[in-house]
Amino acid sequence: MHRCFSKKAHSLFIKAEVDYRKALEINPKSTDAMFNLGNSLLMQQKAKEAMEQFESASKVEKDKDKLAQIYHNMGVILQSSKQYPQCIEAYKESLRNNPKDDETRYNLALAQKLLKDQQQNLS
């Protein structure tokens, strides 16, 4: 059952990717389409492409709540690739836009601990 769900979910993320790319062809400045395309790419383990979409959206988005979500997702990608200093900055930027986001605050604390552990293991 789980495997079947996984295949179904994956096909939905592929369809979403196609649809959001079409939306961006119609309106290349749509930060909602960039963000949602980034999310669909992320769910397909296409982190590099997802990051490109989030970076593009972060340059034009004005809404603080949406910016917080964008930077949060950038932090998640950077954390998963162990780029802790950049990850920490992304989470801090997310919190500047939405200081009440407990999930981002937790992720920031975790990333700071992981960076400290990484630095201790190198010395």
Regions found by a protein language model. Name each.
Residues A16-V18, T31, K116:
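Intrinsic disorder/low-complexity signal
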Residues M1-K22, I26:
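Alpha-helical segment of the N-proximal tetratricopeptide repeat
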Residues N39-S123:
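Feature detects intrinsically disordered, low-complexity acidic/polar segments
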Residues I26-L42:
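Membrane-anchoring signal-anchor transmembrane alpha-helices and their immediate flanking context
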